[in-house]
Amino acid sequence: SDTNEANANNEAEAVSADTVIIADTQCPTSLDLAQSWDSWYTSRWGITETLYKLDENLEPQPFLAQSCEMIDEDTWVINLRDDVTFHNGNKMTAESVKKCWERTGEINARFNELLYIDNMAADGQTLTVNTSKPVPAFMNGLCEPLTGIIDVDAEGDPSVSPVGTGPFEAVSYEVKTRAEVKKYPEYWGGEPKLDGAVINIIGDTSTLAMAQ
C-alpha cells in the first residue's frame, strides 16, 4: 500500500544518507520497460524517464523533450533536449527514441493504444510522429512510463540491466527478491545526491510490518 511504501521510505532515509534501503511488497516481472507494467517500476526507481511528465496540476510538461507541437490532427513534431545521455554515455537522439518506441510497440499492445503511432521520422533531435487517428491526449500519453526511453542498441539484457536516461542506473535485479541501482554521475539533471538504493522485495506484509 501507499502507507507501507511511505513507511519503508522513511525507514530507508534513516538508514543511510548516501544509499537508501527500501522495502516494498510488489515488484516487476523484469526491468524491461516494454514488458507488462514493468515501466512503472523502472520509472519509480529512477532508471527510465519519459519525454513529458505531469506537473502538480496534472498538466503535461516537457521533460526529455523541449517541446511537442501538433502540426495537424494526425502529425506531431517533438523536439528533444540536446543534453541527455544514456547510462552508457550515448546521446539520446530522435533516432534512439524512434527505435525504442518501435520495440515497445512490438512487445506491448498497450503502447499502441496510448499514442496510435502510424510512422515516425527522425532527424537529429527532432522526431515527427504520424498517428493513425487523431490523438488529442497525445502529450498526456508521453507522460506514461511505458513511453519511457532506453538505448535499445546497448549491450546487455534490458530485462536485467536496461540502459535508460534517469538519475540511477540498474546494478542488479532478482525477481521477488532484490533490486539495486546506483547513481549516474553524468545525469542531465545534475549529479544525484544519493549514491544509490537497494530495494528489498518482501511479499509477506506481516514481515514488512515487522521490518518497520
List each model region and its residues.
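Short, low-complexity disordered leader/linker segments with a strong preference
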Residues: 1-20, 59, 103-106
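Residue-level recognition of beta-strand termini and adjacent short loop/turns
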Residues: 16, 72, 121-123, 175
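Short, well-ordered beta-strand elements
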Residues: 16-29, 75-79, 97-100, 127-129, ...
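N-terminal lobe/hinge region of extracytoplasmic solute-binding protein
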Residues: 23-71, 102, 163-164
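Gly/Pro-rich hinge or "lid" segments in bacterial periplasmic/extracellular proteins
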Residues: 59, 142-192, 196, 206-207
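Aromatic- and charge-enriched surface segment that lines or borders ligand/interaction sites
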Residues: 66-107, 128
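Surface-exposed binding/hinge segments that line
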Residues: 69, 110-152
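Short helices/loops that flank or line small-molecule/ion binding pockets
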Residues: 89-91, 206-212
